[in-house]
Amino acid sequence: GMGIKDQNPKVLGNFTPDFSLSLSQNFSYKNWTLSMLIHSQIGGDIFSGTNMYGNGYAGNFTESLEGRAEWYASEDARELAGVATQDWTATGGYLIEGTYAEGSSINGQDVSGQTNQTYINPFDYYERVSRWQDEIHEPFIYDASFVKLRELSVGYTVPESFYKKLKLRSLSLGVFGTNLWLIHSNVPNVDPESSLTNGNGQGYELYAYPNRRSIGMFLKISI
């Protein structure tokens, strides 16, 4: 049931997006104003080293829980039945999507080309695909498409009656923020805009810091 690495090199992804799209909106009602910028990227791929190590060596990410409880239940049943590991067919665990390699057999029956139905220990799977040397990178290559609320601003123009004695022409105040909401992302646990470097390391991510979220206030006075 364990995956086999294809020895023939092939392209697994491309970090260049198909296109980017931004939507800017401005609203006003009486003395209130609201402006926002929604930005999206369609297409592009990213290899996430953070997800590779978080699921693999440490098993800290929730994605690595898939099949874990079922594997423990299968092992409890095996031990209760007094059956050796090599003689036991697991009833649960991690199931890799794919087909059996040519020449594969189970219990003496040829299963070449058939859909994989053999459960394996999730730890063994993630340990196999997260080794830096001779690892299988493909499970940690993600579609980097995303939608973000990039900017949001709310303002209020103070009525003249409140500052008339101050001899001001206008007075407005408000709050603003950037990178407030990752609305949609196909990349778990990390920001899809993360990168390893700003050079030719684009499309790779490893232990990247989250994109900074900024929140502030503004005060505009005309005299």
Each language-model region and where it sits:
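Outer/extracellular conduits and scaffolds centered on Gram-negative outer-membrane beta-barrels
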Residues: 1-223
